[in-house]
Amino acid sequence: MSGHSKWANIRHKKEKTDAQKGKIFSKLGRELMVVAKMYGPDPETNPKLRDVIAKAKANNMPMDKIMGFIKRAAGEIDTTGYEDITYEGYGPGGVAVIVEAMTNNRNRTAGEIRHIFDKNGGNLGQTGCVSWMFNRKGVIVIEKENFPDEDFVMEKALEYGAEDFASEEDVYEIITTPEDFSKVREGLEKEGFTFIRAQIEMIPQTTVRLSEEDAQKMRRLIDMLEDNDDVKEVYHNWEEEE
């Protein structure tokens, strides 16, 4: 299996502050409510909801909080008009950037995203301008500290249909096709595994490095995008040097 992880190398590495964690919970809560309202509040019959629950758990959201958001969706809360939108563009130094958002006002969100790109040495492009540089894959990350038997983890991952397996310094990374992601994740959950990340992502086919000046701009671009209330995920092909 793969010994090198592109995913691990292009994550924007930093400890989240309490305020940032609170914003992540707020965004996940909205996603839980919208998916529960649109497709039903029962995870057994709503596979999209199961996937969002798994993502929330991987971000350390307590189960009672998760269920609280789902229950709110069954009430009078208005989730009409929300839609998923993907933006593509270039960061400083020609870094390819994909932004996934959930919004009930696409004009507002597009304007805000464009402003963030412009302010940090990038530019928002047309749909399809960079997505061809990425592969859509399921990504499941497990901490080695909790499951030290690498052979067992790899055996189970492959048994449930994983496409690739990588052993990194302190984590295992399991890659799946988008179609098999839920099956692999649910199989591993039944085996007792817990995850620090579990979702479908855009993984770059190749990565680029930046000068220190452009790297500082890129960090600001990522921070500002992630801080936007409508943004769910930011993907890029910048490989940050250690």
Swiss-Prot record:
Family as reported in the entry's similarity comment: Belongs to the TACO1 family.
GO MF: DNA binding
GO BP, sorted A to Z: regulation of DNA-templated transcription
Coiled-coil boundaries: none
Pfam families attached to this UniProt entry: TACO1_YebC_N (PF20772), Transcrip_reg (PF01709)
Transmembrane annotation, as ranges: none
InterPro entries: Integrase-like_N, TACO1_YebC-like_2nd/3rd_dom, TACO1_YebC_N, Transcrip_reg_TACO1-like, Transcrip_reg_TACO1-like_dom3, YebC-like
Protein name: Probable transcriptional regulatory protein Csac_0964
Family matches, as Gene3D superfamilies: 1.10.10.200, 3.30.70.980
Keywords, comma-separated and alphabetical: Cytoplasm, DNA-binding, Transcription, Transcription regulation
UniProt source species: Caldicellulosiruptor saccharolyticus (strain ATCC 43494 / DSM 8903 / Tp8T 6331)
Region (Disordered), start-end ranges: 1-20
Keyword Transcription regulation recorded: yes
Cell compartments where the protein resides: Cytoplasm
HAMAP family per the UniProt record, alphabetical: Transcrip_reg_TACO1
